Amino acid sequence: MSSRKQASQTRGQQSAEEDNFKKPTRSNMQRSKMRGAASGKKSAGSQPKNLDPALPGRWGGRSAENPPSGSVRKTRKNKQKTPGNGDGGSTSEVPQPPRKKRARADPTVESEEAFKSRMEVKVKIPEELKPWLVEDWDLVTRQKQLFQLPAKKNVDAILEEYANCKKSQGNVDNKEYAVNEVVGGIKEYFNVMLGTQLLYKFERPQYAEILLAHPDAPMSQIYGAPHLLRLFVRIGAMLAYTPLDEKSLALLLGYLHDFLKYLAKNSASLFTASDYKVASADYHRKAL
């Protein structure tokens, strides 16, 4: 009797573990995260108390949705052996359940529900900045003007001023650490995304000229506020593919929205149509 009870308990535990891997629900992700936090106290000691461990490292980290594949394989092997140890079921029935479960338990495949939820990541642009996005589009695409480069105040300078502003407000150390990480992440995303996602077609010849004139300079040292604002229209789609869990993503969005409020507060000095100039006839020919 005791051996049968143990076998039954083993099957129940293994089935529960296997279900956790198959269904990356929010509750399972949270439980996985809690287990990881308990086992990594040494590393957690160096992190700020109010930050999720996934936020440092420029908004990256290991996702709770992708457990090590070795854990899954071990669970499956035990599951196959269990029926033979208990009630003496026929051997022809043993291979059938694992075959069905192998197709569904692949830890590298994200569920449709989880994918759709990630596609819903949105960064809210303050109402004060939306008219400027429209004017920026009109100046470039309809009036055929170009933002003058290098910018009078580049992206690096804007981010540095924001970081200094937050630090001057007397924030505690862990808050200051978070601001540095967010500012660094914005800069990295800007430099990666500018050439492929943040330019209008009419601006591409100008971008090519900048690359020739400043081959070693990051674009955050060349471009300014209008292109930085465009980043926040696009960045939500990129964040949907980061390995941040729900808590870390919500924390990050809070910091991004705080930065956008800073841009809105200083919009009069950061956004002005006088920074644009009508493109020459020669440039028009290049842009065709």
Curated annotation (Swiss-Prot):
Location in or out of the cell: Nucleus
Organism from which the protein derives: Rattus norvegicus (Rat)
CC terms in the record's Gene Ontology section: NuA4 histone acetyltransferase complex; nucleolus; nucleosome
Gene Ontology biological-process entries: chromatin organization; DNA repair; positive regulation of double-strand break repair via homologous recombination; positive regulation of striated muscle cell differentiation; positive regulation of transcription by RNA polymerase II; regulation of cell cycle
The organism's taxonomic lineage, starting at the top: Eukaryota, Metazoa, Chordata, Craniata, Vertebrata
Domain of life: Eukaryota
Subunit (UniProt): Component of the NuA4 histone acetyltransferase complex which contains the catalytic subunit KAT5/TIP60 and the subunits EP400, TRRAP/PAF400, BRD8/SMAP, EPC1, DMAP1/DNMAP1, RUVBL1/TIP49, RUVBL2, ING3, actin, ACTL6A/BAF53A, MORF4L1/MRG15, MORF4L2/MRGX, MRGBP, YEATS4/GAS41 and VPS72/YL1. The NuA4 complex interacts with MYC and the adenovirus E1A protein. MORF4L1 may also participate in the formation of NuA4 related complexes which lack the KAT5/TIP60 catalytic subunit, but which include the SWI/SNF related protein SRCAP.
Protein name, as recorded: Mortality factor 4-like protein 2
Pfam annotation, one family: MRG
Annotated Polar residues bias: 1-15
Keyword entries, A-Z: Chromatin regulator, DNA damage, DNA repair, Growth regulation, Nucleus, Phosphoprotein, Transcription, Transcription regulation
Predominant cellular place of this UniProt entry's protein: nucleus
Residue ranges occupied by any MRG domain in the UniProt entry: 117-288
InterPro entries reported for this sequence: MRG, MRG_C_sf, MRG_dom
Residues recorded with modification Phosphoserine: S71
Parts forming coiled coils: none
Role noted for this protein: Component of the NuA4 histone acetyltransferase complex which is involved in transcriptional activation of select genes principally by acetylation of nucleosomal histone H4 and H2A. This modification may both alter nucleosome - DNA interactions and promote interaction of the modified histones with other proteins which positively regulate transcription. This complex may be required for the activation of transcriptional programs associated with oncogene and proto-oncogene mediated growth induction, tumor suppressor mediated growth arrest and replicative senescence, apoptosis, and DNA repair.
Positions of region (Disordered): 1-115
